[in-house]
Amino acid sequence: MLLLGAVLLLLALPGHDQETTTQGPGVLLPLPKGACTGWMAGIPGHPGHNGAPGRDGRDGTPGEKGEKGDPGLIGPKGDIGETGVPGAEGPRGFPGIQGRKGEPGEGAYVYRSAFSVGLETYVTIPNMPIRFTKIFYNQQNHYDGSTGKFHCNIPGLYYFAYHITVYMKDVKVSLFKKDKAMLFTYDQYQENNVDQASGSVLLHLEVGDQVWLQVYGEGERNGLYADNDNDSTFTGFLLYHDTN
């Protein structure tokens, strides 16, 4: 045992070609010149424990861009997204082809008011409305044959005209609107002859206005006449109705 300890001691000492000394526990320092030499190297010690991990190194420089990879597989269809905001109005497109003809539409309402009447007898009373009882047209019944007056039911502009036969006497005829004479016609009878007299006028009427003809003056001015061959007529109709 003593021999084995001496051998181990010799192996632990530094070699003869390295001069060392110690300073503190576990620290070997070179020996000064002239120290003891000739010691043999010791046997290698056991490997030490792993040290603590070092800190992360600095980031490296970016590498070169790699080549484009192959397209990936088509993924599953996603959910429907929210409706986006309306886009800007696009440019005007080209004209389309002409469509088919549509069905006839309803026309605008037409206001109608008209009459045309004639005299059946030459017996008339002066200064009274002339009763024209021979009806040519009175579909809207705006002319009253019992009074000889036209009654306005649609406000607007009207045209009135009369054509009378004159025989045996002179005639004076006036057209009235609301008890006011608006137009006068006088014809002087020529003996042994049949005369014709006429008149026409445009009048604006309101609802409820009345228009008629009458002989004015005494009986000697009542030459209004009608028979199977000669007519005396009174006509009126609406040109256009008021829009306001």
UniProtKB/Swiss-Prot annotation:
Changing residue 68 to R: Impaired formation of HMW multimers. Gene3D superfamilies: 2.60.120.40. HMW complexes are more extensively glycosylated than smaller oligomers. Hydroxylation and glycosylation of the lysine residues within the collagen-like domain of adiponectin seem to be critically involved in regulating the formation and/or secretion of HMW complexes and consequently contribute to the insulin-sensitizing activity of adiponectin in hepatocytes. O-glycosylated. Not N-glycosylated. O-linked glycans on hydroxylysines consist of Glc-Gal disaccharides bound to the oxygen atom of post-translationally added hydroxyl groups. Sialylated to varying degrees depending on tissue. Thr-22 appears to be the major site of sialylation. Higher sialylation found in SGBS adipocytes than in HEK fibroblasts. Sialylation is not required neither for heterodimerization nor for secretion. Not sialylated on the glycosylated hydroxylysines. Desialylated forms are rapidly cleared from the circulation. The record marks 230 as: Not glycosylated. GO terms for molecular function: cytokine activity; hormone activity; protein homodimerization activity; protein serine/threonine kinase activator activity; sialic acid binding; signaling receptor binding. It comes from the Eukaryota. It is linked to Adiponectin deficiency: An autosomal dominant condition characterized by very low concentrations of plasma adiponectin. Levels of adiponectin are decreased in obesity and may contribute to a chronic state of inflammation that leads to insulin resistance, type 2 diabetes, coronary artery disease, myocardial infarction, non-alcoholic steatohepatitis, and kidney disease. This is Adiponectin.
